[in-house]
Amino acid sequence: MERKGGRQAELSVITKAKDLCSYILTVTEKSPKRFRFTLTSRIQNHALNIIENLYRANEVFLTKGDLSALDKRLEYQRQAMTECKLLSYMSLVAREQGAILPKQYEQITSKDYDVQNLLGAWIKSDDRRVKN
């Protein structure tokens, strides 16, 4: 994938994760103060950790048959997946406690689901590419 100027296009999973993070930062900014340093900061941290782990995974160069590189990339991908699941749970708690609105929760879970699906597809693709 190439863009103008010879720069590579970003992975769609990273783009979706950035959209998720941006939405979360916007939504949690308006959360009640009593949740700001507990639930909302943890939700924000999970969103940022997802992006961080995706970038780390993408920086691991894979070649056919290089199982050690695959393991390293897979570790970052799994960390990102775990962060997605934790984000989903924390968002549920935030909705139940009134830190975010039900519609905001729906948006977060929808965006999180997209990231998880794309991440799962990336993991499978890497596995096929390296092992075949």
Residue positions per predicted region:
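Amphipathic alpha-helical assembly/interaction segments
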Residues: 1-132
